[in-house]
């Protein structure tokens, strides 16, 4: 089964073609990071306008490599995300579905990130615990044997990725904050400053990062003699400790020995280091997508679309964008 996937939920425009849920035929992504850097974050209207410019170009390049008549299913993200951005990809996918006379699958962006891990780990089977951690989301979920997903914990305020962006801005490091702090922190001491770990010891699976961000803000206002590298490393250590502790606690309490980590923050080198260390000590299997599939991409959309199509799940063409969609 050949699936064409389209992703435009935020600031990446992406098109991919995937055969049988595993063989990559085409994988194109155009990032808008440089466009939004001067704003310090993603501007929704600007993102949508760039999708309108980039998507036709990517589809044209895709169909230079793939005969459109060989596509069996068209899939696109319909939420959650920025509504204007979502509508660009969703509308294009519906148009292709009509013109090619092929079925259409709407894909949940969060579910798509989970499917990214299957591309690199084809032997992974549910049930497993997954931490979805990105600029827009921080959620702990259980993936059931039928591939349905249950949210068992979520952030009550900022996402982890949002906290990275805001602290990077406080430190004058620029945007996007996640990869910049990751790199700067390698030159710092993660034990230099003791920042709070909100909700880490509470008997639930929810998160809160707003207080940690505020603690860094007050620290910077109070202290004058500090190294940016040490602050970045100490802040990152606090975030990673919270994510690791909550995720392994959920897996332990559910009696599940397999854990996946997905989303942009799953690319963080310190998170991967501490996860792998604990998994080795505690006897868990852990799974990450490759770095290229942690951020938004269309391969994960095509993979999620494949799974639904394989089960005969298709969507009507009146499906609308849902910026607040949940799993």
Curated annotation (Swiss-Prot):
CDD domains with a match to the protein in the record: ASKHA_NBD_TsaD_bac
Cofactor remark from the record: Binds 1 Fe(2+) ion per subunit.
Could you say which protein family the record assigns here?
A: Belongs to the KAE1 / TsaD family.
Q: What is its main location?
A: cytoplasm
Chemical reaction(s) catalysed: L-threonylcarbamoyladenylate + adenosine(37) in tRNA = N(6)-L-threonylcarbamoyladenosine(37) in tRNA + AMP + H(+)
Q: Name one GO cellular component term.
A: cytoplasm
Name the cofactor(s).
Answer: Fe(2+)
Please name the gene that encodes this protein: tsaD
> What enzyme category does the UniProt record give?
transferase
InterPro entries given for it? ATPase_NBD, Gcp-like_dom, KAE1/TsaD, Peptidase_M22_CS, TsaD
Could you provide one GO biological process annotation from this protein's UniProt record? tRNA threonylcarbamoyladenosine modification
Q: What is its EC number?
A: 2.3.1.234
MF-aspect GO terms: iron ion binding; N(6)-L-threonylcarbamoyladenine synthase activity
The record's section on Pfam families has: TsaD (PF00814)
Q: Does the keyword Cell membrane apply?
A: no
What is the role of this chain? Required for the formation of a threonylcarbamoyl group on adenosine at position 37 (t(6)A37) in tRNAs that read codons beginning with adenine. Is involved in the transfer of the threonylcarbamoyl moiety of threonylcarbamoyl-AMP (TC-AMP) to the N6 group of A37, together with TsaE and TsaB. TsaD likely plays a direct catalytic role in this reaction.
Subcellular localization, as worded in the UniProt entry:
Cytoplasm
- Which keywords does the record carry? Acyltransferase, Cytoplasm, Iron, Metal-binding, Transferase, tRNA processing
Q: Report residues binding Fe cation.
A: 109, 113, 296
Q: Report residues binding substrate.
A: 132-136, 165, 178, 182, 268
Name this protein carries in UniProt: tRNA N6-adenosine threonylcarbamoyltransferase
